[in-house]
Each structure stands twice: as structure tokens, then as C-alpha cells.
Amino acid sequence: MSVRELVVLGTASQVPTRHRNHNGYLLRWDGEGILFDPGEGTQRQMLRAGVAAHDLHRICVTHFHGDHSLGLAGVIQRINLDRVPHEITAHYPGSGQRFFERLRYATAYRETVALTEAPVAADGVIADTPAYVLETRRLSHPVESFGYRLVEPDGRRMLPERLAAHGIKGPDVGRIQREGAIGGVSLEDVSEVRHGQRFAFVMDTRLCEGVHALAEGCDMLVIESTFLDGDHQLAEDHGHLTAGQAGRVAKDAGVRHLVLTHFSQRYSDPDAFEREARAGGFEGELTVAHDLLRVPVPKRH
């Protein structure tokens, strides 16, 4: 059975708190797991959330500030300790290669797993698989930062009433899907486009073109909202977003489910982030993330 969900491992910005771990997010996409921004303590949070090293297939790092990458050392060593049977690919800003290598080889351990380093240098497609295309866009932060966007290819949805009208049933349904036509009836005659799902992960950044490009038409957008709108100048100065800005981005992009995260420790009321995102005009499904939360990707239209 296919599962598409976000497992939230940590939601703090800069420093962990009593209730929030450093960042960490696992996207389960059918049989694959993509780990985003493993901050300090991610390995333990995986244990608490029921996420095994075997669940990981890709690691995507947006930038090399500690709250988004210090957990790499422990996660990589755990992958090797558990002898994960498949290859792991790591994506990260190429300008931070030295940081990745320091974290990968922070201490002595036995390497048992093939880990492919795939540094990112520019906007564009970084992985093209039968199940999805993974893209990056440059963001605006004091250090080089990239956001990630996963796009599922469009498919086709068979329409029972049209199949019946053309007398197509049983094994012929599978045949027309494979071959594209049967006896003058085309696949387009008995089906419609089923748009693939889209997911985006946007961390530390000011508002910029990359934010909007990543968010466009997403079924789920996971986005930082470090500050509330009253501290918008702090957000701008330090390369971050406010909850209101995140809400406006999601509204303009037609996002279906907005997930807010990466909260400054200066705020004690999580509901304030939802209020400000709503005030920004977003009317879709909205989640203020907390540690160990599971958020299903919205079902296809």
C-alpha cells in the first residue's frame, strides 16, 4: 500500500527548546523516503517517530547552518551501522562541500553503504525517476541555500462510463492503457489527465523568486515561518520569512496544504502563526507543525 506523508522530526530554528528539536523532516513517497535538513538530534527523533535508517533513500540539505545539518554525522553513521541495503543519495549546496565532508567523516566508523554525493550548484532538475522529478531553486539567505520541489508525472484516470460506452472491459482495459488504442478507440477517448502531485520544501530565505517558483501549484508546501509579522524587519535582516508572508505565498501559488515550521524560540503561542498565515489570505488546509507529527499529503483531485 502506497503511503505519502510528511513525518516531522523537529521544528525549532537556530536552537532546540524543551519542546522542539532542531529541524528534520521525512517525506514518505510510496516506497521511498527523503530526509530533509537533519539538524542536531535527528537520529533520536527518528527513533521516537518510528523511522528506521532503512527508510531513507535520499538526504536533501538546504544549507549548512547547524540547525539544518548537524544531524548528518549521526544519520550517516546510523545508515552504515544498520547496513542499509540500498544506495543513498545526498543533495546539498556544492559551496558547502567541505562542511558535508566534515560531517560525513566526523568520527571513525566502518562504511558499509554506498552514499552518493550529489552537490547542487544551480537551479534545475537534480533527479529524474519514474516516480518523480526532483528540482531545486536558489533561495535568499546569508549562506547559499536551495529549496527542493518534487513533481510527480501526470498520469491518466480511466472513466468507467466511457469505457462502457465503447464496449471496453476486462483485459482490454489494461491493453488500451499499455498500447494507447484498441480498434479505433484511443486512450484519450476513455480517460482523462490525472495531474501528478507536487511537494515543496522551503527553508531559510527571504521572499525571492525561488520561493514562488517552488510553491507554485503544490499539494503540500512545507515552509519556514521563523518570525511573526511584527518582527518582519528581523526576518528581512536575517534572511527569513514571517508567517504572514508564508500565508501570502501559499495563497498566490494555489497551495492545497500549507505546513508552517522553523519557529523562533522567542514565541510561546503557536496559534499566532496560523492566525497570521490566515490573515495573509490563505484559506486552504493549514498545519502548524510540532515534533513527531505526521501529515498526509492531500489525496489527488
Swiss-Prot record:
Its catalytic activity?
Endonucleolytic cleavage of RNA, removing extra 3' nucleotides from tRNA precursor, generating 3' termini of tRNAs. A 3'-hydroxy group is left at the tRNA terminus and a 5'-phosphoryl group is left at the trailer molecule
Q: Name one GO molecular function term.
A: 3'-tRNA processing endoribonuclease activity
* E.C. no: 3.1.26.11
Task: Provide this UniProt record's keywords sorted from A to Z.
Answer: Endonuclease, Hydrolase, Metal-binding, Nuclease, tRNA processing, Zinc
Cofactor, how bound (note): Binds 2 Zn(2+) ions.
Stated name of the protein:
Ribonuclease Z
What protein family is recorded?
Belongs to the RNase Z family.
Keyword tRNA processing in annotation? yes
Q: What class of enzyme is it?
A: hydrolase
User: Which residues act catalytically here?
Assistant: D67 (proton acceptor)
Task: State the gene name recorded for this protein.
Answer: rnz
What cofactor is this protein dependent on?
Zn(2+)
State its role: Zinc phosphodiesterase, which displays some tRNA 3'-processing endonuclease activity. Probably involved in tRNA maturation, by removing a 3'-trailer from precursor tRNA.
Which SUPFAM superfamilies does this one have? Metallo-hydrolase/oxidoreductase
**Which InterPro entries is this protein grouped with?**
Metallo-B-lactamas, RibonucZ/Hydroxyglut_hydro, RNase_Z/BN
User: What is said about its interaction partners and assembly?
Assistant: Homodimer.
User: Which residues of this UniProt protein bind Zn(2+) 1?
Assistant: H63, H65, H141, D204
Where Zn(2+) 2 binds, per the record, is at: D67, H68, D204, H262
